[in-house]
Amino acid sequence: MVKETTYYDVLGVKPNATQEELKKAYRKLALKYHPDKNPNEGEKFKQISQAYEVLSDAKKRELYDKGGEQAIKEGGAGGGFGSPMDIFDMFFGGGGRMQRERRGKNVVHQLSVTLEDLYNGATRKLALQKNVICDKCEGRGGKKGAVECCPNCRGTGMQIRIHQIGPGMVQQIQSVCMECQGHGERISPKDRCKSCNGRKIVREKKILEVHIDKGMKDGQKITFHGEGDQEPGLEPGDIIIVLDQKDHAVFTRRGEDLFMCMDIQLVEALCGFQKPISTLDNRTIVITSHPGQIVKHGDIKCVLNEGMPIYRRPYEKGRLIIEFKINFPENGFLSPDKLSLLEKLLPERKEVEETDEMDQVELVDFDPNQERRRHYNGEAYEDDEHHPRGGVQCQTS
């Protein structure tokens, strides 16, 4: 039992979630609420990052489960939180704060794929908009020699204001310079490049050919190094494609195995059957249960080498795992004579010798709402006893 579930609720997972479930939840939420896509959801992005930072660390998670958020804040596991952007970059293959200072931002895109795509391999063309250095001004933003140091921030890109918060007490506030928008330099409007309007970069359409190899997994990243947004003075970042697998109507993937449920009739469970299965590469395989091989409800069997191809070893495959569900016939499907004949064919049932101490009871269909209705009626009855209701009386003349 955990002390509180706030972090689990933020990620939308249960307290017993596995690391894979935590990663999947963080990946989807972080991409959805990233400041680049949702500038107004900064606080939500921060909460998601903090929750994942704690729950993805075994020691911090144990501490949180026992003592809640307060235990984390008190520093029992190296308290305090990292930068949400650092967590995002490390998760998606970028790096920490120091790397972002030397390189442009990584651009992360989610690519929806089917289980068939991951089984057979596929190629997708993805059209993206990215920043590239303006070739008209070669990334200067204007004419040669037109760029000058911003006098307001002295080239730092930051302004420092002193704010008095009490007698003898001042607060130093650092903010982005409004004069140069944090660039540390400015260009006279008449000297600005007409192509980029002094921004040094322009938007350009980029077509990426994404190769999805056989056996790739949900959440796997495909990185295009140096294809991210360009910025003067910085090495271009990467474009990172994150595969997001859609649910399949028949199969569920479990590592290298494929799992499915199969309904069979009672006669098939007792007397054998043949069942066709359409595979993800459009083949049809036939599974056989021979007469005399009894299949019980909930039995799990498998077909070797019919699961998912193994990544980078596509000629090897996992297992196709099948769980069987038995469909029993409806009441009265046999006449009394045929039922008696069937009983003679089946293994003998055990008879119970009744004694005087035994009571005969009747089996009825279970109604899950019966207890709820009885509980509700009981409360209403008690309420009437403690608070008799005065009904509106009819007028008499």
Curated annotation (Swiss-Prot):
<feature type="modified residue" description="Phosphotyrosine">
    <location>
        <position position="381"/>
    </location>
</feature>
<dbReference type="GO" id="GO:0043065">
    <property type="term" value="P:positive regulation of apoptotic process"/>
</dbReference>
<feature type="repeat" description="CXXCXGXG motif">
    <location>
        <begin position="150"/>
        <end position="157"/>
    </location>
</feature>
<keyword id="KW-0862">Zinc</keyword>
<keyword id="KW-0636">Prenylation</keyword>
<feature type="repeat" description="CXXCXGXG motif">
    <location>
        <begin position="193"/>
        <end position="200"/>
    </location>
</feature>
<feature type="modified residue" description="Phosphoserine">
    <location>
        <position position="83"/>
    </location>
</feature>
<feature type="zinc finger region" description="CR-type">
    <location>
        <begin position="121"/>
        <end position="205"/>
    </location>
</feature>
<feature type="region of interest" description="Disordered">
    <location>
        <begin position="352"/>
        <end position="397"/>
    </location>
</feature>
<dbReference type="Pfam" id="PF00684">
    <property type="entry name" value="DnaJ_CXXCXGXG"/>
</dbReference>
<keyword id="KW-0479">Metal-binding</keyword>
<keyword id="KW-0256">Endoplasmic reticulum</keyword>
<dbReference type="InterPro" id="IPR036410">
    <property type="entry name" value="HSP_DnaJ_Cys-rich_dom_sf"/>
</dbReference>
<dbReference type="GO" id="GO:0051082">
    <property type="term" value="F:unfolded protein binding"/>
</dbReference>
<keyword id="KW-0492">Microsome</keyword>
<dbReference type="InterPro" id="IPR001305">
    <property type="entry name" value="HSP_DnaJ_Cys-rich_dom"/>
</dbReference>
<keyword id="KW-0539">Nucleus</keyword>
<feature type="binding site">
    <location>
        <position position="180"/>
    </location>
    <ligand>
        <name>Zn(2+) 2</name>
    </ligand>
</feature>
<dbReference type="GO" id="GO:0009408">
    <property type="term" value="P:response to heat"/>
</dbReference>
<dbReference type="GO" id="GO:0043066">
    <property type="term" value="P:negative regulation of apoptotic process"/>
</dbReference>
<dbReference type="GO" id="GO:0051087">
    <property type="term" value="F:protein-folding chaperone binding"/>
</dbReference>
<feature type="binding site">
    <location>
        <position position="134"/>
    </location>
    <ligand>
        <name>Zn(2+) 1</name>
    </ligand>
</feature>
<keyword id="KW-0863">Zinc-finger</keyword>
<keyword id="KW-0496">Mitochondrion</keyword>
<dbReference type="InterPro" id="IPR018253">
    <property type="entry name" value="DnaJ_domain_CS"/>
</dbReference>
<keyword id="KW-0488">Methylation</keyword>
<protein>
    <recommendedName>
        <fullName>DnaJ homolog subfamily A member 1</fullName>
    </recommendedName>
</protein>
<feature type="repeat" description="CXXCXGXG motif">
    <location>
        <begin position="177"/>
        <end position="184"/>
    </location>
</feature>
<dbReference type="GO" id="GO:0008270">
    <property type="term" value="F:zinc ion binding"/>
</dbReference>
<dbReference type="Pfam" id="PF01556">
    <property type="entry name" value="DnaJ_C"/>
</dbReference>
<dbReference type="GO" id="GO:0051223">
    <property type="term" value="P:regulation of protein transport"/>
</dbReference>
<feature type="lipid moiety-binding region" description="S-farnesyl cysteine">
    <location>
        <position position="394"/>
    </location>
</feature>
<dbReference type="GO" id="GO:0016020">
    <property type="term" value="C:membrane"/>
</dbReference>
<dbReference type="GO" id="GO:0006457">
    <property type="term" value="P:protein folding"/>
</dbReference>
<dbReference type="GO" id="GO:0001671">
    <property type="term" value="F:ATPase activator activity"/>
</dbReference>
<keyword id="KW-0449">Lipoprotein</keyword>
<feature type="modified residue" description="Cysteine methyl ester">
    <location>
        <position position="394"/>
    </location>
</feature>
<dbReference type="InterPro" id="IPR008971">
    <property type="entry name" value="HSP40/DnaJ_pept-bd"/>
</dbReference>
<dbReference type="GO" id="GO:0070585">
    <property type="term" value="P:protein localization to mitochondrion"/>
</dbReference>
<feature type="binding site">
    <location>
        <position position="193"/>
    </location>
    <ligand>
        <name>Zn(2+) 1</name>
    </ligand>
</feature>
<comment type="function">
    <text>Co-chaperone for HSPA8/Hsc70. Plays a role in protein transport into mitochondria via its role as co-chaperone. Functions as co-chaperone for HSPA1B and negatively regulates the translocation of BAX from the cytosol to mitochondria in response to cellular stress, thereby protecting cells against apoptosis. Stimulates ATP hydrolysis, but not the folding of unfolded proteins mediated by HSPA1A (in vitro). Promotes apoptosis in response to cellular stress mediated by exposure to anisomycin or UV.</text>
</comment>
<feature type="binding site">
    <location>
        <position position="196"/>
    </location>
    <ligand>
        <name>Zn(2+) 1</name>
    </ligand>
</feature>
